């Protein structure tokens, strides 16, 4: 999974399949739903990858650094080619980073959402209201067109479709 910052957001894409060749016609859709919203006031940004790879969070790094924020990545497997300004901490440091951060972005697969709720629910403190956002990774086979419900996520008050209402949700909705 590759991400790279662009002037008005970021580009995210999976690896290109081997059978693709120059001149191949592609049909692309997107973007779908709602993405991360990095507050302009954020100066201490924590990126928390509950899955094996923090790749879906990488698109927040350059915008955060551009606004002179300190960036800490919390994950079990540190990726290569991170900017030198990004600190990497193990998941065991989550409490310390949550206490420090004024903005927290988390990435979790829908199947592991209960683990995230359990883990964040035990923390003494999270960034102020709206300061914690969660990317819930789930299949979106219809591309957000058919309201098929396969991407549905159970939040505190209701079911939401990741393709339209997410896939990034405020912790206030999730927790």
Predicted regions and their residues:
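Ferredoxin-reductase
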Residues: 1-24
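Aromatic-residue hotspot detector
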Residues: 10, 34-36, 169
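Solvent-exposed, flexible loop/coil residues
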Residues: 40, 144-146, 172-173
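Local cysteine-cluster metal-coordination motifs and their immediate loop/turn environment
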Residues: 137-167
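Phosphate-binding loop/pocket of nucleotide- and phosphate-handling active sites
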Residues: 165-169, 173-175
């Amino acid at each position: 999974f590759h991400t790279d910052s662009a002037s008005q957001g970021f580009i995210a894409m999976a690896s290109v399949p081997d059978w693709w060749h120059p001149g191949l016609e592609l049909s692309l859709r997107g973007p779908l739903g709602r993405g991360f919203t990095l507050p302009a006031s954020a100066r201490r940004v924590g990126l928390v990858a509950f899955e094996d790879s923090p790749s879906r969070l990488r698109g927040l790094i350059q915008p955060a650094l551009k606004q002179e924020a300190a960036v800490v990545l919390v994950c079990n497997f540190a990726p290569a080619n991170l900017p030198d300004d990004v600190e990497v901490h193990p998941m065991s440091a989550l409490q310390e980073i949550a206490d420090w951060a004024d903005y927290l972005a988390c990435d979790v697969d829908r199947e592991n959402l209960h683990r995230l709720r359990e883990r964040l629910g035990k923390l003494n403190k999270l960034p102020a209201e709206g300061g914690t956002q969660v990317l819930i990774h789930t299949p979106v086979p219809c591309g957000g067109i058919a309201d098929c419900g396969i991407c549905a996520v159970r939040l505190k008050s209701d079911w939401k479709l990741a393709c339209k209402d997410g896939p990034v949700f405020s912790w206030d909705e999730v927790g």
